[in-house]
Amino acid sequence: MTNSVSSNRSEKYNIAAFFSGVGGIELGFEQTNEFRVVYANEFDKYARQTYQLNHPDTYLDGRDIHDVQPEDIPAERVDVIMGGFPCQAFSIAGYRKGFDDDRGDLFFELLRMIEGCKPRAIFIENVKNMVGHDHGNTFKVIREALTENNYFIKWKILNGKDYGNIPQNRERIYIVGLDRKSVV
């Protein structure tokens, strides 16, 4: 089932997506007909194979995000940066080492892309446990980093089963940030 919204805009918003997996979140944005994914980064080769099937027109970069520079994104402008950095460092299913985990620095790599591209909006998703991890300090660091980069942020924990025909019962945190200069 595809839901689409007709747009009065002649130009779509450009998205650069990181930790893209198979591209499910991007698909939702594209189905609004308001957004176009101009760049995606995914390190896992099997996820990339599926991503290419779901998004054949998107430039897909398979490098480790540590090796990617903001200027590598093939677009004049990036309106939205989105990412769901790996959650094992914060998940109750993992060891919960947070920023001390080898994967825990990946938020800061996403932040590096945000700082370099200066998008008008950001969209981040992760496990709900990130909010309370390390007595809330992990989430505080993330909120402060985004706020210091001039983003007005709102966040909410949502369960996919409550929104449409999604076959999972899993709570996730969603963070939306708008560049303060873009907010009217």
Where are the model-predicted features located?
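Class I S-adenosyl-L-methionine
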Residues: 70-78, 88-184
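Cofactor-binding loops of NAD(P)H-dependent oxidoreductases
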Residues: 63
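The conserved SAM/SAH-binding core of class I Rossmann-like methyltransferase domains
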Residues: 41
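Adenine-nucleotide cofactor-binding loop residues
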Residues: 66
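Short, conserved SAM-binding/catalytic segment
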Residues: 49-60
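Conserved SAM/SAH-binding beta-strand->alpha-helix loop
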Residues: 44-45
